[in-house]
């Protein structure tokens, strides 16, 4: 079957930005002008095509990366609309991994905002060529050139305006195309009646100045163009287009466009620029991977190459599990068997679909360069490679950040227990940043994610999609107890109730153990003062007491106990009596050994613009944190600190507030350390009050 579009005429692009810059509205207009939809859907009305989840339509934000196919000027354009909220970073991350080009949308009023920097860094990580659409030029305070300056200064981008707005705020009437040296005036509200004309006289000199700057910038991308520019003093429209495209593909040049998606101005020119300047799959370097023998290999984007694809998203669907794939090489046929080389298993392809948000078109095959979805994959998850069985390869996978916040979830009824289990498995399959674990001590189910909004949305989905009723609480910190000195302990259990009595007597020496040893027991009973059959029960009594602690009910760790003496009764002694005596001796010993409470310390790394460094360090200190290192590179500060886990709840929200959303942090367990006396007293008293 022939390709509907040659590979050179395919564009896989993402639309990414800070929350509220107008990404989804821009996508909606692209679909309207390219004929996918015949009525414009607005985000604030809850009618956007790409916002297909109930939560997205209610909140007016995009949570999941919706994939849509459309066409423009005889080119196939596959678009992914990504979320701008920092809690959904994984959605942006997975989009960047499978795209060839990005339209970064900036607000003409807000300019370079926090999440824009995060998205820009993600695009840098995967070397994705990009262009910028400065949106919302109709808003009060809109300033195209101010945003241009911020992109150059804050993102260190080699940005070049290829358009200028005619008017701004309420007077935005058209756009100057500096490449074609023409003006486009919008004659109706829908943006479908556009008049091409000469540049307005009052803007002619400004446009000429910016066009000259553009020529100079573009000429620097190519030696041949430099010669042409020096020889003729200018470049033709075709030379400019060629130079801009070369500059974008070499990741050096970022063309700037402007308009207002909401007011239907400038979107068709954005589509023209996607076709003219963003890369086709054949323009980007071949995907890299590893062969079974460990050798590195590449797969060029070509239908005749062996089949390889990356699963970049898994989604529960009324018709079954949808696995989104980016085709890198070869052809994938409906009904075929493929290998998941990441897990070394075979999978069957039941059906193939191309998506238009929540609408879908079934196809018989997907080809190199396509974005599509597969039904029928049972064990494939995000980041897995699918390939031909004859020539396996494992492609570079996704960078998946560690979750930073966790809460406990408790089903309200027994009936909810099973539903909760199914919901958690399904949600964890879809979202690799969502983790589920069981706290062995509290027996609570703990869910972890990228932020409070992330977990809020997931809990909301449990309720709506899986009909689970659950109580959501704050997670409990897993404290520990230990001892700081040595002493003796003694326990004597003697009971006489009529007939046979109970008797057990144990004497122990107790001392701090080596870090990481937990509970260590040594038997030094000599001369049969305690028969062998009672040693084990005595040790078990101590171990059980160790597990439930003495101070505040937390496990006692790193303690060495030596049983040195004791006594027994021929008739009344029993295993139970010695188990109780062992426990009594252990409690007696701990009280004399300076017991202390330990808390989990976390290694925390915060990355933030330099301006916020003082606030970050002050806040970490107020959380009982110890700053262990800091560095500044290119205006970005990094702070390494050790902070008690108990003080880190709510930190994601606090950091966002302190840094206007521009700070990011990672956190992992480091070790246990002693809790300061005043804090320990409060914890002990609270726990003793609860018991």
From Swiss-Prot:
InterPro entries: EFG_II (IPR041095), EFG_III (IPR009022), EFG_III/V (IPR035647), EFG_IV (IPR047872), EFG_V (IPR035649), EFG_V-like (IPR000640), EFTu-like_2 (IPR004161), G_TR_CS (IPR031157). This is Elongation factor G. Residues 8-282 form the tr-type G domain. One of its GO terms (biological process) is ribosome disassembly. SMART domains: EFG_C, EFG_IV. Its main location: cytoplasm. Catalyzes the GTP-dependent ribosomal translocation step during translation elongation. During this step, the ribosome changes from the pre-translocational (PRE) to the post-translocational (POST) state as the newly formed A-site-bound peptidyl-tRNA and P-site-bound deacylated tRNA move to the P and E sites, respectively. Catalyzes the coordinated movement of the two tRNA molecules, the mRNA and conformational changes in the ribosome. Pfam families: EFG_C, EFG_III, EFG_IV, GTP_EFTU, GTP_EFTU_D2. GO terms for molecular function: GTP binding; GTPase activity; translation elongation factor activity. The gene is fusA. Belongs to the TRAFAC class translation factor GTPase superfamily. Classic translation factor GTPase family. EF-G/EF-2 subfamily. Keywords: Cytoplasm, Elongation factor, GTP-binding, Nucleotide-binding, Protein biosynthesis. SUPFAM superfamilies: EF-G C-terminal domain-like (SSF54980), P-loop containing nucleoside triphosphate hydrolases (SSF52540), Ribosomal protein S5 domain 2-like (SSF54211), Translation proteins (SSF50447). It is found in: Cytoplasm. GO terms for cellular component: cytoplasm. HAMAP family: EF_G_EF_2_B. GTP binds at residues 17-24, 81-85, 135-138.
């Amino acid at each position: 079957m022939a390709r509907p579009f040659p590979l050179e005429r395919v564009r896989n692009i993402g639309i990414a930005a800070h929350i509220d810059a107008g990404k989804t509205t821009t996508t909606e207009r692209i679909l309207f002008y390219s004929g996918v939809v015949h009525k414009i859907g607005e985000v604030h009305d809850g009618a956007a095509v790409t916002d297909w989840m109930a939560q997205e339509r209610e909140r007016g934000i995009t949570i999941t990366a919706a994939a849509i196919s459309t066409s423009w000027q005889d080119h196939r354009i596959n678009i992914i609309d990504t979320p701008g909220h920092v809690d959904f970073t994984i959605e942006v991350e997975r989009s960047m991994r499978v795209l060839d080009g990005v339209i970064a949308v900036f607000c003409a009023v807000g300019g370079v905002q926090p999440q824009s920097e995060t998205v820009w860094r993600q695009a840098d990580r995967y070397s994705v060529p990009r262009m910028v659409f400065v949106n919302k030029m109709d808003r009060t305070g809109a300033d195209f050139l101010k945003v241009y300056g911020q992109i150059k200064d804050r993102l260190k981008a080699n940005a070049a305006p290829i358009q200028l707005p005619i008017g701004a705020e309420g007077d935005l009437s058209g756009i100057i195309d500096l490449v074609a040296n023409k003006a486009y005036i919008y004659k109706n509200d829908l943006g479908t009646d556009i008049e091409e004309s000469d540049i307005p006289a009052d803007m002619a000199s400004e446009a000429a100045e910016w066009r000259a700057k553009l020529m100079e910038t573009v000429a620097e991308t190519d030696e041949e163009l430099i010669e042409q520019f020096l020889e003729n003093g200018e470049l033709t429209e075709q030379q400019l287009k060629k130079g801009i495209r070369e500059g974008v593909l070499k990741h050096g040049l970022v063309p700037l466009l402007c308009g207002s998606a909401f007011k239907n101005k400038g979107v068709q020119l954005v589509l023209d620029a996607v076709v003219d300047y963003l890369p086709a799959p054949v323009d980007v370097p071949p995907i890299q991977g590893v062969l079974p023998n460990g050798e590195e290999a590449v797969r060029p984007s070509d239908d005749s190459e062996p089949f390889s694809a990356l699963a970049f998203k898994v989604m529960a669907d009324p018709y079954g599990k949808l696995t989104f794939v980016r085709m890198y090489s070869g052809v994938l046929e409906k009904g075929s068997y493929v290998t998941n080389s990441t897990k070394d298993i075979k999978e069957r392809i039941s059906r193939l679909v191309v998506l238009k948000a929540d609408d879908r078109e079934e196809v018989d095959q997907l080809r190199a360069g396509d974005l599509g979805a597969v039904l029928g994959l049972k064990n494939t998850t995000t980041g897995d490679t699918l390939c031909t069985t004859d020539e396996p390869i494992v492609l570079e996978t996704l960078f998946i950040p560690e979750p930073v916040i966790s809460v406990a979830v408790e089903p309200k009824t027994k009936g909810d227990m099973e539903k909760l289990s199914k919901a958690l498995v399904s949600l964890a399959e879809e979202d690799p940043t969502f983790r589920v674990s069981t706290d062995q001590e509290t027996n609570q189910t703990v869910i972890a994610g990228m932020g409070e909004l992330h977990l809020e949305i997931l809990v909301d989905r449990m309720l709506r999609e899986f009909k689970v009723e659950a109580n959501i609480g704050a997670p409990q910190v897993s404290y520990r107890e230990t001892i700081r000195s040595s002493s003796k302990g003694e326990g004597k259990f003697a009971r006489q109730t009529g007939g046979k009595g109970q008797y057990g007597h144990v004497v122990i020496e107790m001392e701090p153990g080596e870090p990481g040893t937990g509970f260590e027991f040594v038997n030094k009973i000599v001369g049969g003062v305690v028969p062998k059959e009672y040693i084990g029960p005595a040790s078990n009594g101590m171990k059980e007491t160790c597990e439930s602690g003495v101070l505040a009910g937390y496990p006692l760790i790193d303690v060495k106990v030596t049983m040195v003496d004791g006594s027994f009764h021929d008739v009344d002694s029993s295993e139970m009596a010695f188990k109780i005596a062992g426990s009594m001796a252990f409690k007696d010993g701990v009280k004399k050994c300076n017991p202390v409470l330990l808390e989990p310390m976390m290694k925390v790394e915060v990355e933030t613009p330099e301006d916020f460094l003082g606030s970050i360090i002050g806040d970490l200190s107020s959380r009982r944190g110890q700053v262990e290192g800091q560095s500044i590179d290119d205006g970005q500060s990094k702070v390494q600190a050790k902070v008690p886990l108990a003080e880190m709840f709510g930190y994601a929200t606090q950091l966002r507030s302190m840094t206007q959303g521009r700070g990011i942090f990672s956190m992992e367990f480091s070790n246990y350390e002693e809790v300061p006396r005043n804090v320990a007293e409060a914890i002990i008293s609270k726990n003793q009050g609860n018991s």
